[in-house]
Amino acid sequence: NSRLDTLQAAVLNIKIKSLSKWISNRKKVANNYLDLLEKNSFIHLPKIDSENVSHSWNQFVIKLKNYNYDINNDYSELFETDVNKNNSLRNLLKLRLSEKGINSIIYYPIPIHAQIAYKNKNFSREKLINTERVCTEVLSLPMYPEISYEEQVYVAENLNIILKSCINELQICA
């Protein structure tokens, strides 16, 4: 259980006044990314399907098809994020982006049913195929309220160029 002490509560009390502004800025950042990346057919962008839904955009997650995915793969290689051990499009793109100074993150690389604590629970992998596939395909781009439009353009332009290069390197046909 986590409890706030007096100091943490005081800091939160000040920060909470800025929350609406931060979320508003994140929405602008997300809309910029959506506009900058919408023409790239290799990227699946996040979508909001309802006007009644409000997204906080804590993360901006793109999805890249994993052409190496095979349900028969062992967990140890399937969810590996090191490009030297699993040369997937997502992992290679992450490496190449970092070489350009662009930090991208794989937040949830291993689904719960594949984690050691659940090893003996006998989950049916066939019933969780979408979960497994998504865990091997998602990548989060830099997302924070203060990111400038110019920085986003840099991220998007490099992502588009690097992604084409990765597709050629991996000899992926659309």
Give the residues covered by each predicted segment.
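PLP-dependent aminotransferase class I/II
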Residues: 1-174
